[in-house]
Amino acid sequence: MPRGVYLGFDFGYKRIGVAVGQRLTCSASPLSTIEAKAGIPDWNTIQKVITQWNPQALIVGLPTCIDDRELYTTSAARHFAKQLHKRFSLPVHLVDERLSTVEARGYLFEQGGYRQIKKAEVDSIAACVILEQWLQQSE
């Protein structure tokens, strides 16, 4: 696998968390949260992020239940992934994002308690968790 830059996305109907990571260290950092309206992303902002980072691939979290059932957001996340590929002609990989938001909230709580848990930060850190999971699995 090439040792380039990758972008991770935590899709949501109101917000999409974004993270950037690299293969060399198998680590990721939260970037930002992009607003969405009823599941429709701000494609101009996504374009700017992709242009700025020039990633080799895009990683999208796929929400599922603990018992492998799909959630109401699963098909929307798949559609988002297909649109990313269609619009930007980059490889897109789906990753099981089960419990990524719980892990992100736990991380923020450790950093400063409930006052540190802001929805936008949770989304970008969840994207970070998703991307790191993919980087480690694809080694």
Swiss-Prot record:
CDD domains: YqgF. GO terms for cellular component: cytosol. One of its GO terms (molecular function) is nuclease activity. Keywords: Cytoplasm, Hydrolase, Nuclease, Ribosome biogenesis. SMART domains: YqgFc. Its EC number is 3.1.-.-. It is found in: Cytoplasm. GO terms for biological process: rRNA 5'-end processing. It comes from the Bacteria. Its main location: cytoplasm. Could be a nuclease involved in processing of the 5'-end of pre-16S rRNA. NCBIfam families: RNAse_H_YqgF. This is Putative pre-16S rRNA nuclease. The lineage of its organism: Bacteria, Pseudomonadati, Pseudomonadota, Gammaproteobacteria, Legionellales.
